[in-house]
């Protein structure tokens, strides 16, 4: 399983950049393996992201904005969902991963 974070390296919006950095920093700090997918560099990846976000999770108008998070091809959520899971200490569940505490206990 690979966590994939769809982001935009050349976003002109400071808020989007901060959200992307927050997700990446959290994953790095918790040693969660992930892949960054830059949708500004690949139209194919951008279209894949748009197509694989469930209709009920898409905005009423416009396209979904990065960051968008997937576990392989399974949609996890956007930044707001990530932030909520971070606040409630359920990020591993949000990402479809076993918690690191559970894996350490099994070792």
Curated annotation (Swiss-Prot):
Domain of life: Eukaryota
Main location class: nucleus
Keyword Nuclease in annotation: no
Gene Ontology annotations for the cellular component aspect, listed alphabetically: cytoplasm; nucleus
SUPFAM superfamilies: Thioredoxin-like (SSF52833)
Keywords carried by this UniProt record: Nucleus, SH3-binding
Locus of motif SH3-binding: 61-67
GO molecular function: SH3 domain binding
Pfam families: SH3BGR
Sequence similarity: Belongs to the SH3BGR family.
Record-given protein name: SH3 domain-binding glutamic acid-rich-like protein 2
